[in-house]
Amino acid sequence: MISTENLTKRFGRKTILHGISLRADAKQITLMVGPNGAGKSTTIKVLAGLIRPNSGTAHVNGFDIIKRRIAAQRSTAYLPQRPSFHPKLTCLEVLRFYAGLRGVPVSRCEAMLQLAGLGDAARMHTEKLSGGMRQLLGVAFLLLADAPVLLLDEPGLSLDPGWRKWLQQKLRFEAERGKTILVTTHLIAEWNDVADRCLLCRHGVIERELDPRNLPDDFDEIDSSTKRPEFTSIEKELTRNGGLFSITR
């Protein structure tokens, strides 16, 4: 389970998170959607323990991310939007290194590569991987430790539709096994049949919850659904006229 209360985060003078409060439950896939700069990726990084919030609280698998930082991090697996690996190591070598850090039997590494469709690339150096293969290696990392909480930031952007569908089905399977899964995405319509909940993030807060069974194709449709009816068919033009402002309909 994931829970946050009034999380804030500033970078210099710019505030990115203005009070994020959310809950994601076990056995569910929770989406976080919203425009660029809404705070989705920052929230994921806070939960993964990569950056520290300025205020607020967050718990991952029951552990406070500040007071029980190590326990919280061991409870999570994180897939960044653009996974990066040591360029001179092979896929199998980097996975074995990660397995050692997480206390996972190295015998699982080759099985994870096979699962992610990278069995034939096990001894390929990561610098030679395509964007899609790099993303799949990230998925192998995500699943290797069998962590109870999975955090995914824009998964599948580098994957073709077939592999994106495979990833969604795999995450559905992991949720049914009891995992808590939080996903940020711009490909919102593709998750209609997969997600259990969908949170709309905008301006550093969770604005509202959307129906995951009826997600639109893009954010313009979300925006139009939230406008007041009297303004949807009115085109306003603000012009300066003799020092006065007038609105022309």
Task: Name each region found by the language model.
Residues 150-154:
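Catalytic Walker B motif of ABC-type/P-loop ATPase nucleotide-binding domains
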Residues 96, 100, 106-121:
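Conserved ABC ATPase "signature" region
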Residues 48:
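Helix-to-loop junction immediately C-terminal to a conserved catalytic motif
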Residues 56-67, 71-72:
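Conserved ABC transporter NBD signature motif
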Residues 161-163:
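Helix N-cap at the start of a conserved alpha-helix in ABC-type nucleotide-binding domains
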